[in-house]
């Protein structure tokens, strides 16, 4: 297939302008659908903008493409593998991965994944409207779901190393320049950022080596839990977007889950922890906050301003993670 019209997306500025352009992408979306016998495929609309070009077809399928930018080849392999792993366990609701492949042609091959479309909203869209009791019920169900995800066996020939070392190296790289990254984000107050270097413990203190290396979703934000809210009751339909999945540790998983999805609320955190059944709670608040600081994304941005106006990182850790 002639993919030359997509060559402009090798440039970052052009990518930002074009990755949601339905007129540009519709012929390629329809070609993918035709290749896999998905018909009809006339109505194409853009999905919620993220990192990758993603389009909804006839409200039945989602076609997601992976470009050269943002390490697309690795993201494709990771999301395909993690999605198939999640589908193997009925305790983990997720979107059915219907097809995969690549457009081909000259230059970048544009690998893609095709998922069944889920008519839903994200829990992040309605979290402020959900009752306190319902939030606890959601969190309790998530505890079992995430425990199941973390228990999936890792294949020796898959993209997820069966070793703690790559994750330890990743955290070490995140530690370098951690304070400066938070200054650039501007979410945490300057007096807390000044404390980061002294607050961060040795990397080994953040990894539970008593557990085997395991898969983590690594970006469990409110955007990535889909469902329906009817008469004040939430029904979970799918956990989605495994593009950042990796071999990792519980504390890294907790960062986006608690600070983004739960908005730092401790009652859902307590329910989640009880359902997950974490064995070791030694120095829990510090290890949890330190891993949040090292996260590849700014997981603090949704927290209420009054919550992060703590005098010290130690007091912030207690406010967020003492349950």
Give, region by region, the residue ranges found by the protein language model.
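Short, flexible/disordered intra-domain loops and linkers
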Residues: 13-18, 70-74, 309
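Phosphate/pyrophosphate-binding loops and the adjoining catalytic core of nucleotide-dependent enzymes
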Residues: 1-29, 83
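Active-site acidic catalytic loop and adjacent metal/ATP-binding pocket
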Residues: 50-58, 63, 201-252
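Membrane-helix interface segments
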Residues: 92-93, 132-134, 211, 264, ...
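Helix-rich C-terminal or lid/interface subdomains of diverse kinases
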Residues: 140, 177, 244-250, 255-323
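ATP-binding pocket architecture of kinase catalytic cores
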Residues: 41-165
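An alpha-helical support segment within catalytic cores of ATP-dependent transferases
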Residues: 20-40, 102-106, 113, 119, ...
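Short, surface-exposed alpha-helical segments at coil->helix boundaries
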Residues: 26, 80, 266-270
């Amino acid at each position: 297939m002639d993919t030359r019209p997509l060559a402009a997306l090798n440039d970052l500025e052009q990518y930002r302008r074009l990755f949601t352009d339905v007129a540009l992408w519709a012929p390629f979306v329809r070609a993918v659908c035709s290749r896999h016998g998905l018909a009809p495929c006339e109505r194409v609309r853009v999905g919620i903008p993220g990192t990758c070009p993603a389009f909804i077809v006839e409200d039945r399928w989602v076609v997601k493409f992976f470009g050269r930018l943002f390490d697309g080849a690795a993201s494709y392999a990771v999301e395909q593998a993690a999605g198939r792993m999640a589908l193997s366990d009925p305790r983990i609701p997720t979107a059915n991965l219907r097809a995969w492949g690549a457009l081909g042609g000259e230059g970048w091959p544009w690998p893609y994944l095709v998922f069944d479309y889920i008519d839903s909203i994200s829990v992040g869209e309605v979290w402020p409207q959900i009752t306190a009791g319902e939030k606890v019920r959601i969190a309790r169900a998530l505890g079992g779901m995430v425990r199941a995800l973390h228990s999936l066996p890792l294949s020796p020939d898959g993209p997820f190393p069966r070793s703690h070392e790559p994750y330890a190296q990743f955290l070490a790289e995140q530690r370098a320049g951690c304070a400066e990254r938070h200054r650039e984000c501007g979410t945490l107050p300057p007096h807390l950022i000044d404390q980061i270097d002294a607050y961060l413990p040795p990397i080994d203190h953040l990894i539970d080596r008593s557990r085997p290396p395991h898969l983590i979703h690594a970006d469990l934000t409110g955007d990535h839990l889909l469902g329906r809210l009817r008469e004040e009751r939430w029904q979970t339909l799918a956990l989605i977007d495994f593009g950042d999945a990796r071999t990792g540790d519980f504390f890294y998983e907790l960062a986006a889950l608690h600070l983004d999805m739960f908005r730092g609320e401790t009652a859902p955190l307590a329910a989640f922890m009880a359902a997950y059944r974490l064995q070791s709670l030694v120095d829990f608040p510090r290890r949890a906050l330190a891993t949040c600081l090292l996260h590849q994304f700014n997981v603090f941005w949704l927290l209420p301003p009054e919550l992060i106006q703590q005098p010290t990182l130690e007091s912030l850790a207690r406010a967020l993670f003492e349950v």
